[in-house]
Amino acid sequence: MIRAEHIFKSYTNGKTVTEVLKDISLEIEGGLCVILGASGSGKSTLLSVLSGLETPDSGKVVCAGEEISAMTDKARTDFRRRKVAFVFQQYFLLPHLTVEKNVKLGADLAGNKNYAEMIEAVELGDKKKKFPTELSGGEQQRVSIARALAKNPEVLFLDEPTGALDEKTGRKVIDFICRLQRERGFTAVMVTHNTNLAEIADTVIKMNSGKISEVYQNQTPKSVFEIGW
């Protein structure tokens, strides 16, 4: 579970102070949560604060049973290694390593040994000896998903994971994420500007100008292949 209580976050540039998160409180019980909002609404900053990549100016954040807002930088780094994983719009694969070694690197960082299973789970077993430059964009993103899940995280954070992909490839990547989330039971929190993806989520959080404007639950989430794009 993830819980935030009265979170504020601002950035300072010279004499200019910009409030990005304004008194955010929320609970995410599990399943797939989608955070929606226009550019500049604060959704990516919220993801960073919930995951421990950044600290709030004030307020409390609990993620995977630990109060990360009270941790030192070193403790938060250790928390991220142990408990959470990330998938971004950019793949951040090491070009000199094969698919297999890129995924193994994620597993090794967390002391896990299930990297081979994750390569099969994202249907890249036949390409495990290939290098990132030999893969399509969708395949590279699947490698980044496998690398993240090879850590066996309690929470997977995704920031615009299909932003650089075409519709067909994007749907397939989202389908992988949803299927693996259901099979493995981790919590997934995804930031996206694609409002149609609200239909596939268990929980939807809408943001506007640094505040939560709406939160609701879907009783029967749809397949990504049943919605618009």
Residue ranges and their predicted role:
Residues 67, 112-127:
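Conserved ABC ATPase "signature" region
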Residues 131-141:
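Conserved ABC ATPase signature
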